[in-house]
Amino acid sequence: MSYAIIETGGKQLKVQPGRFYDIELLHVDPETSHTIDKVLLVSHDNEVTVGQPFVEGATVEGTILRHFRGRKVIVYKMRPKKKTRKKRGHRQEITRFMVNAINFNGQVIGATENGTTTPTTANVEVATTEGSDSEE
């Protein structure tokens, strides 16, 4: 199992190939590839490389799936015994980021199969019902 710890949007996040993550807004068009080079740690086959502060030559490649807004957070301020009340809401802009590969010194150490994100339907069985077969 290979993983990396990246920094994006002022936060640190543990990422693995083949998974998607909701991160702070990236000003990149959806359905395009994006590379993050702020990699703090890379782990592959029980071998851990820690950067100071970043790992040289390590990148995380992925695809921007979509942009959306998070859940609304209500901020309510009230001063007791006064008629002062403030109610405000905030919705954070979020980007859904699919990790395709983790690269380290020019080698791909973790990647998804073909970099695709669509599920396959090869193993799906369709159940059909036949006429009037009933248990006797």
Swiss-Prot record:
Signal peptide: none annotated. GO terms for cellular component: cytoplasm; ribonucleoprotein complex; ribosome. This protein binds to 23S rRNA in the presence of protein L20. It comes from the Bacteria. GO terms for molecular function: rRNA binding; structural constituent of ribosome. PROSITE patterns: RIBOSOMAL_L21 (PS01169). InterPro entries: bL21-like, bL21-like_sf, Ribosomal_bL21, Ribosomal_bL21_CS. GO terms for biological process: translation. This is Large ribosomal subunit protein bL21. Part of the 50S ribosomal subunit. Contacts protein L20. Belongs to the bacterial ribosomal protein bL21 family. Keywords: Ribonucleoprotein, Ribosomal protein, RNA-binding, rRNA-binding.
